């Protein structure tokens, strides 16, 4: 019965998709992306930060084999999402030279690797804070309004899907390695602390005219190769770190509850919480059944901790075929895994495109 429901929902999405494609128009007027390295398409390239991915072997399986700044060997889940929605190009990184003129009319990408709900996370790594991403979005709105006028611009903003994917850096690159935060907050208390900036962010987006917002849950933090290496049991690199996964589950529960309250209090808002925890956990725990060979080690280098500048052309041991791997580097999914995640997002996101 469960499989039948999934198939029925998938068929509905496909039917809806082809209906939109048949008109030559995407299903929504624009796609706005905000968050961290999981969805950063190159904004960090222009920052003075170590958290970058604009060099080989990143991007080796992307279009023209270019390292665009995406933290993967190829496409991000949001790239697949843009394709499925009927867009013929991906949202341009807002800090890039391409972010001008009519290129902005179908959306933009404001995400920055190492950003988080807590602005302190981004500040520590010299990334773009979520508050600054929102300021950049306001600037973007002014540019679009100048191009097409207020009436059409407002329709673009209200009809656009706004995707937010962040939070992992708050835990993996801040809380777990910061003794001060560890001493002040339990993981549960830290999750509570992050709900306020999340609520404020959604409220601010809503005030700017956004009516379709999607936010991703945390992934199974304890199954990321770098997390297993850094926080797992000594000598045991084959098991997810359960306490980290439990922290993610707790956070995700709070995220769902907070999102429900926001939906109830903001008239006309469609807010969808995208579950990426379970699809990625399924791939990590059952790689072969999902078409993968390896889920404990990443493709890049030794597959244990390498990410960003540690994952480079000189990294010894990088795999030859990333499609066999769930993870490209120590923190980020491969293109093949991103495709699976995107397929799940499409089914879950029906309320945002209907």
Curated annotation (Swiss-Prot):
InterPro entries: GDSL, GDSL_lipolytic_enzyme, Lipase_GDSL_AS, SGNH_hydro_sf, SGNH_plant_lipase-like
GO MF entry, a single one: lipase activity
One GO CC term on file: extracellular region
Coiled-coil regions listed in the entry: none
Domain of life, per lineage: Eukaryota
Signal peptide stretch: 1-24
Protein name: GDSL esterase/lipase At5g03820
Species assigned in the record: Arabidopsis thaliana (Mouse-ear cress)
């Amino acid at each position: 019965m469960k499989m039948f429901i999934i198939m029925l929902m998938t068929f509905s999405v496909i039917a809806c998709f082809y209906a939109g494609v048949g008109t030559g128009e995407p299903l929504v007027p624009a796609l706005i992306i905000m968050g961290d390295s999981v969805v950063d398409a190159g904004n960090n390239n222009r920052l003075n930060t170590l958290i970058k991915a604009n060099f080989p072997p990143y991007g080796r399986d992307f279009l023209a084999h270019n390292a665009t700044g995406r933290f993967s060997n190829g496409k991000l889940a949001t790239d697949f999402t843009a394709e499925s929605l009927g867009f013929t190009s991906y949202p341009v990184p807002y800090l890039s030279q391409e972010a001008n003129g009519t290129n902005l009319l179908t959306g933009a990408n404001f995400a920055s690797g190492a950003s988080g709900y807590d602005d302190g996370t981004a500040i520590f790594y010299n990334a773009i804070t979520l508050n600054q991403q929102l300021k950049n979005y306001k600037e973007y709105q002014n540019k679009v309004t100048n191009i097409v006028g207020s009436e059409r611009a407002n329709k673009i903003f209200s009809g656009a899907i706004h995707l937010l994917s962040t939070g992992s850096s708050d835990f993996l690159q801040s809380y777990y390695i910061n003794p001060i935060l560890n001493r002040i907050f339990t993981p549960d208390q830290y999750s509570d602390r992050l709900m306020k900036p999340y609520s404020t962010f959604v409220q601010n987006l809503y005030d700017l005219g956004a009516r379709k917002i999607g936010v991703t849950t945390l992934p199974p933090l304890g199954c990321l190769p770098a997390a297993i290496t850094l926080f797992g049991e000594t000598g045991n690199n084959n098991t997810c770190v359960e306490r980290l996964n439990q922290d993610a589950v707790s956070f995700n529960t709070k995220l769902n509850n907070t999102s429900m309250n926001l939906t109830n209090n903001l008239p006309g808002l469609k807010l969808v919480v995208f579950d990426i925890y379970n699809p990625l956990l399924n791939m990590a725990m059952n790689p072969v059944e999902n078409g993968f060979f390896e889920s404990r080690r990443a493709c890049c280098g030794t597959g244990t901790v390498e990410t960003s500048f540690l994952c480079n052309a000189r990294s010894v041991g990088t795999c030859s075929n990333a499609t066999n791997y769930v993870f490209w580097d120590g923190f980020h999914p491969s293109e093949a895994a991103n495709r699976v995640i995107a397929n799940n997002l499409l089914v879950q996101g029906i309320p945002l495109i209907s």
